[in-house]
């Protein structure tokens, strides 16, 4: 229903997110490799929103971490971010302890999924939680 409402001009939650994504992709296509720069999303989004959909609400966050990273840091930034998660998967699979293997696999999966619905690594608390759990899950205690 919300997608239908969006096409009719309604300002629903999903409609706003669709609009954020459509407008963000316009900017990403112009700056695909290195993006527009860290922290420049709000200004660039305001410009593209005024151009494409001035009747719709603007935002300082596209509510999708992948879109945010692509827009600000380009493909280089997205690959760098995904490399962190790849390395976490690699470390978890190499752990001899089942609990570390399972938890070490679950943490990146959780974040990779929820980052489709919001920019969770943009907030201080969720970033701190991610780093805190990562520091314990991927530390090789046996080597000390």
Where are these regions (language model features)?
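Hydrophobic transmembrane alpha-helices and their immediate junctions
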Residues: 51, 72-112
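Membrane-interface micro-motifs in multi-pass membrane enzymes
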Residues: 62, 70-74, 121-129
């Amino acid at each position: 229903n919300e997608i239908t409402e969006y096409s009719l001009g309604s300002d629903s939650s999903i409609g706003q997110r669709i609009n954020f994504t459509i407008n963000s992709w316009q900017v990403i296509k112009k700056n695909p490799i290195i993006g527009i720069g860290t922290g420049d999303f709000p200004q660039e989004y305001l410009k593209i929103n005024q151009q494409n959909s001035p009747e719709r609400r603007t935002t300082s966050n596209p509510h999708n971490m992948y879109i945010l990273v692509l827009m600000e840091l380009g493909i280089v930034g997205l690959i760098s971010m995904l490399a962190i998660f790849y390395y976490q998967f690699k470390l978890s699979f190499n752990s001899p302890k089942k609990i570390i293997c399972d938890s070490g696999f679950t943490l990146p999966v959780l974040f990779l999924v929820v980052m489709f619905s919001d920019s969770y690594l943009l907030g201080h608390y969720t970033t701190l939680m991610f780093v805190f759990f990562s520091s314990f899950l991927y530390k090789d205690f046996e080597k000390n």
